Swiss-Prot record:
Top-level lineage group: Bacteria
Species the sequence originates in: Sulfurihydrogenibium sp. (strain YO3AOP1)
EC code(s) of this entry: 4.2.1.9
GO CC annotations, alphabetized: cytosol
GO process annotations (BP): isoleucine biosynthetic process; L-valine biosynthetic process
Role this protein plays: Functions in the biosynthesis of branched-chain amino acids. Catalyzes the dehydration of (2R,3R)-2,3-dihydroxy-3-methylpentanoate (2,3-dihydroxy-3-methylvalerate) into 2-oxo-3-methylpentanoate (2-oxo-3-methylvalerate) and of (2R)-2,3-dihydroxy-3-methylbutanoate (2,3-dihydroxyisovalerate) into 2-oxo-3-methylbutanoate (2-oxoisovalerate), the penultimate precursor to L-isoleucine and L-valine, respectively.
UniProt protein name: Dihydroxy-acid dehydratase
Taxonomic lineage: Bacteria, Pseudomonadati, Aquificota, Aquificia, Aquificales
Amino acid sequence: MRSDEIKKGIERAPHRSLLRACGLKEEDFGKPFIGIANSYIDIIPGHVHLQEFAKIVKEAIREAGGVPFEFNVIGVDDGIAMGHSGMFYSLPSRELIADSVETVVQAHKLDGLVLIPNCDKIVPGMIMAAARVNIPTILVSGGPMAAGHTSDGKPIDLATVFEAVGGIKKGLIDEKQLIDIETHACPTCGSCSGMFTANSMNCLAEALGIALPGNGSILAIDPRRKELAKQAGRQIVELVKAGLKFRDIVNQETIENAFTLDIAMGGSSNTVLHLLAISHEAGIEFPMEKIDEISRKTPTLCKLAPASQYHMEDLDKAGGIYAILKELSKKNLLHLDRPTVLMKTIGEAIKDAEIKDTNVIRPLENPYNETGGLAVLFGNLAPDGAVVKAAAVDPKILVHRGTAVVFDSEEEAIEGITNGKVKEGNVVVIRYEGPKGGPGMREMLAPTSTIMGMGLGDKVSLITDGRFSGATRGACIGHVSPEAAAGGPIGIVQNGDEILIDIPNRKIELLISEQEFERRMKEFKPKKKEIPSPWLRRYSKFVTSANKGAILSDECS
């Protein structure tokens, strides 16, 4: 066992002495040491219940013959951090989480690892760490929130509240209606109830083979979630005994499986960033072009909020993630021989899964679209690619040619949109919000929700080198690479320029002459921004482009 390095032999008497002070007995020194990375925190609704949840995991580990060691991990609530300077810290927190989990695991030579995340950056951050340390790992998240309902019974969620803000500014709803939505949208603990970033990542963990069936869809308040915690605690001890490590499960083919599921279920566009980052940590090269290749052959089988009225509880009742995977396997779209934490292949694991509601999960014969819910666009405006959640775009605006209205920050954009600078037919451009330029690649949920709330969702497109919340819907193209701060062409767009967005043909073009394009690029000098935070200055210096997963470069030059 790895942990023998800190507990065996005469030289380790001081180490054992310290461990005895933690409550260990003599018999514990012959057992596997299992780390539990717990992201319990009081200010994130997806995490408020994780303290008790971790106790279930710990007890199951003890019963299975392991010694559990729980440690804490930070977290940021993207919804609460949204629309102000707090969002600068959201994506950077992913790197802090990865570094901190790696630090604890390696410093204490743990034999196995249970990850207990739930919300946006915490899930990928923990998985990135697991890819680095490469020990037996199982992820068991806290589960989704139940959908809310207005007084008249309409299903709602957090995205509804953001859009209601735009609605009240436009005069489409009154304050009483806003209060009704606000007070009913988030009724329980858990990760926000649609196919937003947190739930997307927790679902993808099933396709990666590192989570148990039901991890993505069983509600936080469902008694089955506690059973999942017990099973995870027992199973991690078996994984350690079997020596089945993270990279034994996750390889190039597994990442392809995850992207295939992601595209079929209409996952958040943020998942592209996170899966690319996880790939990097696992030593896997995964170009953006490969994602588009998968998207072109993968049908959209599922549309949950914000793309429809369905929520995670509906997906769970319809058969969950395994039902989607089983359907995809019928078209030979998956690598079925990849192992999982169940110690059986993904093909064996999904063998008995079935769709129980074809309104929520459509069969292959009746997909929402023949191609995928995520699309990667290329063109002179995004030579290294851009990402759009095509499943959440109104069909009327899948192809859009419009005039640019340019903003150099999210705050400028919100002010401009609410003050009427954006008209029907415009293409809103928000730049200097990329990984370096933000810094931190803020989510543009407030501008997009304002556009939707004002009734412009099928009349206006938005392009940014920032990113979007999983709750975003509409023609919102993010992750434009290279970003403006790195000298990308998005930095040369001027008010009134014509832009073509063609999602079916994967194009994004600035419609100016080649000579004018070259002249502007030659003269372009990216704006420099004052960054008061020492941490964010370091982040801005070392972070890479969105098409590389916005990971931190380990080159110190």
